[in-house]
Amino acid sequence: MTSAQLDFSRIDLRGQAPTTAELRHRLPRGGTDVDSVIPTVAPIVDQVREGGARAALEIGQRFDGVTPDSVRVPAEVIDAAVGTLADDVIAALEEAIKRVRAFHSAIRPEDKQVEVAPGGIVTERFIPVQRVGLYAPGGNAVYPSSVIMNVVPAQEAGVESLVVASPPQEGGWPHPTVLAACKLLGVDEVWAVGGAQAVALLAHGSTAEGGEELEPVDMVTGPGNIFVTAAKRLCRSVVGIDSEAGPTEIAVLADESANAVEIAYDLISQAEHDTMAASVLITDSEKLADEVVAEMNERYHITENSERVAEALSGQQSGVVLVDDIAAGIRAANAYGAEHLEIHTEDAHGVAAQITNAGAIFIGRFSPVPLGDYAAGSNHVLPTSGTARHSSGLSTLTFLKSVHVIDYNEEGLRGVADTVITLSKSEGLPAHGEAISARTSTANTNGTEV
């Protein structure tokens, strides 16, 4: 029996010279209307802010039909979770942790001290956020990899206090694979709460039944569905957030030298995440485009998540973009600003060097997106929906605050006093200059008047 053919759209830009604005309008892009769920999520956030842990558990019962015995997962439950995993899964998690830690440790910036003039020193200090809440979603798949991608950078940044929140499953606790990942990472504070109510509880904190304090966090990170994203938006005046993440997306920039079978596999792999996932092929080869679509039609129906894949690949957010040449493809890729961008061209490194807008760039056939999803060492929490044009993925830097420390002595202040006084007068703020004059015109080294 022949399976239905994918409705993989095709946009032909050949013979045209679209502007950046036109490209952004014409390239495949799904819509995630966070505003549409704000009326649903705002009452949840309000209820948790007022009612704390009890309200969060009641909301979880209402939506998911599960109520854990407590918000905080007992240590013995976390410890026991590792024993539920097969040895190869434990080994895979440990290898992924090792690689992600190696990279994120190496990229932690050092403090930098600069003497901008004699007697004038400015230092940039990198100070970790004190307490962070990391969300690990449930839903279509279990994501221990998201625990790794959030926890490791925070640890390497030096965050003192970490809590992971993840929705309870049928047994009343988060999925054992998520708990096992927490154990392997040394995270001992896990909350069995999910959805928008988890974000609100992380932001506002509470006193749990029995008197245990659920301390609020300073920052919330991690992926989630549209309701989690809306809760992040509503709580961002209380806590910092990493981003408002939309459905996952992959763009592949390829020429006729690319392997159609491998590209088809890669486009399908991201489509299995979500029915709204975007899979886009940008190419100057119509022959390659035809081959990739044919391969996807041959393969999608035998994947475990075939219905989800078919809906994602047939959605308005997915399709082929035909361009005149790779230079035009680069312009299209930069206008699109993909979460994940694979480069399959003869000069893949040269092309990659010209990409300015992408959450992560994967060079060549041996660097596929699934590698980055799990164990390349890079992070898989990346900007979506075109926000790679101005935002970065999660990393050690996400959990560090850059603080400038100004340390001038008398010589340094006198050397720049006239500049400050002149500028303050020019802006109509003379008191600023007077604060300088008070130190340079009458002060001696003891700070007393001459």
Swiss-Prot record:
CDD domains on file: Histidinol_dh
A biological process from GO: L-histidine biosynthetic process
Enzyme class: oxidoreductase
Domain of life of the source: Bacteria
UniProt cofactor note: Binds 1 zinc ion per subunit.
Keywords linked to the UniProt accession: Amino-acid biosynthesis, Histidine biosynthesis, Metal-binding, NAD, Oxidoreductase, Zinc
Functional note: Catalyzes the sequential NAD-dependent oxidations of L-histidinol to L-histidinaldehyde and then to L-histidine.
Gene Ontology molecular-function annotations: histidinol dehydrogenase activity; NAD binding; zinc ion binding
Chain segments annotated as transmembrane: none
Pathway(s) the chain acts in: Amino-acid biosynthesis; L-histidine biosynthesis; L-histidine from 5-phospho-alpha-D-ribose 1-diphosphate: step 9/9
Protein name, per record: Histidinol dehydrogenase
Residues noted as binding NAD(+) in the record, renumbered to the chain: 135, 197, 225
Cofactor(s) for this UniProt protein: Zn(2+)
One cellular-component annotation, GO: cytosol
Active site: 339 (proton acceptor), 340 (proton acceptor)
Organism: Corynebacterium jeikeium (strain K411)
EC identifiers of the protein: 1.1.1.23
Protein residues bound to Zn(2+): 270, 273, 373, 432
Family: Belongs to the histidinol dehydrogenase family.
Residues reported to bind substrate: 248, 270, 273, 340, 373, 427, 432
One Pfam family in the UniProt entry: Histidinol_dh
Record's catalysed reaction(s): L-histidinol + 2 NAD(+) + H2O = L-histidine + 2 NADH + 3 H(+)
